[in-house]
Swiss-Prot record:
Protein name in the entry: Serrate RNA effector molecule homolog
InterPro entries for the chain: SE/Ars2, SERRATE/Ars2_C, SERRATE/Ars2_N
Compositionally biased spans, kind Basic residues: 362-372
KW Aminoacyl-tRNA synthetase (keyword) present: no
Stated family: Belongs to the ARS2 family.
A biological-process GO annotation: regulatory ncRNA-mediated post-transcriptional gene silencing
Quaternary structure, from the entry: Interacts with cbp20, Dcr-2 and pasha.
Keywords: Nucleus, Phosphoprotein, RNA-mediated gene silencing
Statement: the UniProt record of this protein carries the keyword Phosphoprotein: yes
Ranges in coiled-coil conformation: none
Function as written in the Swiss-Prot or TrEMBL entry: Acts as a mediator between the cap-binding complex (CBC) and RNA-mediated gene silencing (RNAi). Involved in innate immunity via the short interfering RNAs (siRNAs) processing machinery by restricting the viral RNA production. Also involved microRNA (miRNA)-mediated silencing by contributing to the stability and delivery of primary miRNA transcripts to the primary miRNA processing complex containing drosha and pasha.
Subcellular location: Nucleus
PTM sites of type Phosphotyrosine: 82
Length: 948
């Protein structure tokens, strides 16, 4: 009761309490608080005030706060014990847990994939800066599971000290080291086996190591390379390759060469290459036409003769189709236009129809005015609704009256034509003589009663007749001369009618096709379980689909992949992208977006590459890379061992006088006589006699020296690498799976503008650095030996088959055994063994393939696997010793540079000292610490526990 009275009195004395904020009143009340004992009622006021946390937080809460204490909202948890919370900043923003963990429901949008790597930062932050655990605690170790719960690293391996804690105290040092080595080997084997089991059913993993799928994929890639090689040789022979230089100033010429290769790879002809000379058309802009009343249109073939009369004759376009038509497109949609009937018949009919339609429109307008006036006078809802319905009907009739009349006449004419053609086929004579007589009579009869539709049939497209004429001349020897002077036959007329649509396709194929220009869609998220066939099944429903490419998965993306879907240029790519975004594959959104065209296809490299000395070095490197890649994919038949000499022995053979084996023997045309350009020449004697040393050149530098002959040789090698092997030499990289990407031969790096002068030191440094960057192409991939794979846990096929037989042999009772594969019972295990090898041979073959599958994975020195846990690597003594306070401290910063909201530098106290913790005192080195001095009585007895 006393508390209530005191509170009431204090509120009554507060004169301006309605004009002040809660925080201001709180501070004033805090100032008026007497310094009494803890039993005072006013000392407990802060506990009841939700905006006061000084006393409850612990640690001398006398300071005023200008914001609420967020620690009061934590609920019943451990409170901070140190420091003054008066000036504390709010805690860092709580990160969401990982989507793949079991305690939280995964996000259905990404199917368990963490695209922003928030879990890595969350684990790191919670282990160091959490208010609920001290900084000296070890970070939580996340175990690796299957593909769904796969972590970003392997679990932490025990160090030697931790391993010793699990062993007996009386164990010897040699025994400890032996057991620890076995532990590390078993740990590595276990991780490889777990990774294999987690990913063996995924398509990308099968394409790499499965004994059947990997061979099929390798043959497919080799077929792509063979096709590229044929195209390059063709362009090399016709002079296209030799007419261009790999310089950035010749960007247009380089792009033309690359586009020529793409058109050839797509199956284009020399006629299609003319599309490169045409100005690229603007990207069509699509608009959706909204028209009511679905009405079917009758399409007729437009005659090329009538193109000049197209504007004069009325064109009937169906208003019902909600089709998507591109704007600013002339001939791309020429076959979608509806042709008009011949001018002779249409000239008279529209006049009569127009006059009738004008009379109708006048009557309708007058009736409309009357209805408007009557609608103003009357106020009934029925009259207004009926008038609105009449207006809608009149609008529709007004719009479609003329078209309906013409459409009905066209249908009648089409039926007449069909009946006449059927009559001609039925009355076809047996002998050629009778055929000529009967057909002549039919022509005369048809001239007497000729309809407008028959005139349109007589005026067939000229191009279609020219295409079919040679074939028809060979098949039909007898011709008929009509009154108009044209030669025709019955079979010719029938063939023209039957192959009318095919002829239109031939007409369109005669135009150059821009096969190098495509439209594409980028898929951001593809689960590892999604196969290429599933994506193709979704995309084949859209017209213009060409191919799909799927990238290899990345460990930092939780083995999610990216994809590119390629379509022809004339499709509405945005509509397809919208449709793909509304679909899900295996409960995973693909994240489809439109892929833009390449902005800069020719990009400049360092201009020092044009120097003669650098060019000679580049020729040597290019030749080595070409030899290595050609041998890897077996593009050219290998020459005999006597004919091929490596680079290092080429000089020795020439010095011994063996000129027959001089150089490198290869059937690759770009490597013919390549060794002649690898031998460096210099005027050493002349420079020595004239006293021209290289000291001045090193100090001042020398101008860039270009050798056009060497550059021409290098350009052939660079273009061969780019076109055939998809290796961009001046960017020291390879563009993988380029044959399935939207842009084949898309980007190339060329020599940029050369500097004025260059020193020899710069040249040597550049050559050395560039060779190190190209080591991935220079070194041959060697598989691991059997002994090395055995150490990694390689399996034996017969041993695994025996394990399979034992696992499927179950003893039910005495002399009663069961085979789980078939459910049959046998008297002994030997009968089950015989039964498995006879009746379940495919299961045994699967076991053998599984063993080969696993061993292929182990033999790859660049096999994919989870990276080692940071705690498994050796750490410096400063972190693991006395100064760290913990066995392992993860890196201070997250993988990205930005820190979460609310993060302050005061919270970065050496990986410890988070919220409400005092800053950790750094210990000084031993020589800077104050030496403790002990005082003792000389008369006292000796004490071993005194200071020095």
């Amino acid at each position: 009761m006393a508390d209530s009275d005191d509170e009431y009195d204090r509120k009554r004395r507060d004169k301006f309490r309605g004009e002040r904020s809660d925080s201001y009143r709180t501070e004033r009340r805090d100032d008026r608080r007497p310094l009494g004992g803890s039993g005072s009622a006013r000392d407990e006021w802060s506990d009841r005030n939700p905006f006061r946390g000084g006393a409850s937080a612990g640690g001398g809460g006398g300071g005023a706060r200008h914001r609420p204490d967020y620690s009061d909202y934590r609920g019943p948890g451990p409170r901070a014990r140190y420091g003054s919370p008066g000036r504390d900043l709010p805690p860092a923003k709580r990160m969401r847990p990982d989507w793949g963990d079991g305690d939280v429901r995964p996000n259905p949008r990404f199917g368990g994939y963490d695209p922003y790597l928030m879990q890595a930062w969350n684990d790191h932050y919670q282990s160091i800066h959490s208010a609920y655990s001290h900084g000296s605690h070890m970070p939580p170790v996340r175990e690796s599971g299957g593909s769904g719960g796969d972590s970003l690293t392997q679990p932490a391996m025990l160090n030697l000290k931790q391993f010793l804690d699990t062993q007996d105290e009386n164990i010897s040092d040699s025994e400890v080291m032996r057991k620890y080595t076995e532990y590390k080997t078993d740990f590595k084997r276990q991780q490889l086996n777990e990774f294999f089991v987690a990913h063996k059913d995924e398509e990308w993993f099968k394409n790499k190591y499965h004994p059947e799928d990997s061979v099929r994929r390798a043959e497919e890639q080799r077929g792509f390379l063979k096709r590229r090689t044929d195209v390059f040789v063709e362009l090399l022979e016709n002079g296209t390759i030799g007419s261009v230089k790999v310089d950035s100033v010749q960007g247009d010429a380089l792009i033309r060469v690359l586009d020529t290769c793409v058109i050839k790879l797509e199956g284009g002809t020399d006629e299609d290459l003319k599309a490169l000379d045409e100005k690229p058309k603007e990207t069509p802009v699509y608009e959706r036409k909204h028209d009511p009343a679905p009405v079917k249109a009758v399409d007729e073939v437009k005659s090329p003769k009538k193109e000049t009369e197209k504007e004069a004759s009325p064109v009937i376009v169906s208003p019902q189709r909600k089709s998507v038509k591109p704007l600013n497109s002339d001939d791309e949609n020429w076959d979608e236009e509806v042709a008009a009937p011949p001018k002779k018949d249409v000239e008279e009919e529209p006049k009569a129809l127009e006059s009738g339609s004008e009379d109708k429109s006048r009557r309708k307008k007058s009736a409309k005015r009357k209805r408007v006036n009557s609608g103003d006078d009357s106020s009934s809802e029925s009259d207004s609704s009926s008038s609105s319905d009449d207006e809608d009907e009149e609008k529709l009739k007004k719009k479609y009256d003329v078209e309906d009349g013409l459409r009905s006449e066209q249908k009648a004419e089409a039926e007449k034509d069909k009946e006449m053609q059927d009559a001609k086929v039925i009355e076809a004579p047996e002998s050629p003589k009778e055929a000529t007589e009967n057909s002549a009579e039919e022509v005369k009869a048809s001239d007497a009663a000729e309809t407008p539709a028959e005139e349109a049939e007589q005026e067939k497209p000229e191009v279609a007749e020219e295409v079919n004429r040679p074939k028809q001349d060979q098949e039909n020897g007898d011709k008929i001369t009509t009154e108009d002077g044209e030669t025709k036959s019955d079979s010719e007329e029938n063939k023209v009618m039957e192959t009318e649509t095919i002829d239109l396709d031939k007409v369109r194929d005669g135009q150059p096709r821009a096969l190098h220009r495509t439209s594409s869609i980028f898929l951001r998220n593809l689960a590892p379980s999604i196969t290429k066939a599933e994506i193709e099944a979704v995309c084949t429903r859209f017209s213009g689909y060409l191919r799909v490419a799927i990238a290899d998965p990345l460990v930092e993306r939780r083995w999610y992949r990216r994809g590119w879907i390629t379509f022809t240029r004339d499709v509405n790519i945005k509509e397809i992208c919208w449709s793909l975004n509304n679909q899900r594959l295996r409960d995973c959104e693909m994240g489809a977006i439109v892929n833009r065209d390449l902005s800069r296809r020719v990009r400049p490299a360092n201009g020092i590459t044009a120097h003669k000395q650098v060019v000679r070095s580049d020729i040597k490197l290019c030749a080595k890379i070409i030899l290595n890649l050609d041998e890897r994919f077996r593009l050219w038949p290998e020459p005999t061992s006597d004919d091929s000499i490596p680079f290092d022995r080429a000089g020795e053979s020439s010095a011994n006088g063996n000129t027959s084996t001089y150089g490198i023997k290869s059937k690759n045309p770009v490597l013919q006589n390549i060794t002649d350009y690898l031998i460096e020449e210099a005027s050493a004697e002349e420079e020595e006699l004239l006293g021209l040393t290289g000291e001045n050149k090193d100090a001042e530098g020398e101008p860039i020296e270009r050798d056009e002959h060497l550059l021409a040789v290098l350009d052939r090698l660079v273009l061969y690498l780019r076109i055939v092997h998809s290796v961009d030499y001046y960017n020291h990289c390879e563009y993988p799976y380029e044959d399935e990407m939207p842009n084949r031969c898309g980007i190339i790096h060329a020599r940029g503008p050369a500097p004025s002068r260059v020193t020899s030191n710069d040249i040597h440094e550049y050559v050395k650095t560039y060779e190190s960057k190209l080591q991935q192409f220079l070194t041959k991939t060697a598989l691991l030996s059997d002994e090395e794979t055995k150490d990694l846990g390689a399996k034996d096929a017969e041993t695994e088959v025996e394990k399979f037989v034992q696992a499927n042999t179950q003893e039910l009772a005495k002399d009663k055994w069961l085979c789980p594969l078939s459910g049959k019972k046998f008297k002994g295990p030997e009968f089950i063994r015989k039964h498995i090898f006879n009746k379940h041979e495919e299961k045994v073959d699967e076991v053998r393939k599984e063993v080969q599958y696993f061993n292929n994975y182990l033999r790859d020195p660049k096999r994919p696997q989870l990276p080692e846990h940071p705690g498994s690597s050796k750490r410096p003594e400063s972190e693991s010793g006395r100064g760290g306070g913990s066995g392992y401290r993860p890196p201070m910063y997250p993988p990205f540079s930005g820190m979460p909201y609310g993060f302050s530098p005061s919270m970065m106290g050496g990986g410890r000292g988070g919220r409400n913790f005092p800053p950790v005192r750094r210990e000084l080195p031993l020589e800077h610490q104050r030496r403790l001095i002990g005082y003792h009585d000389l008369d006292a007895p000796a004490n071993s526990d005194m200071f020095d």
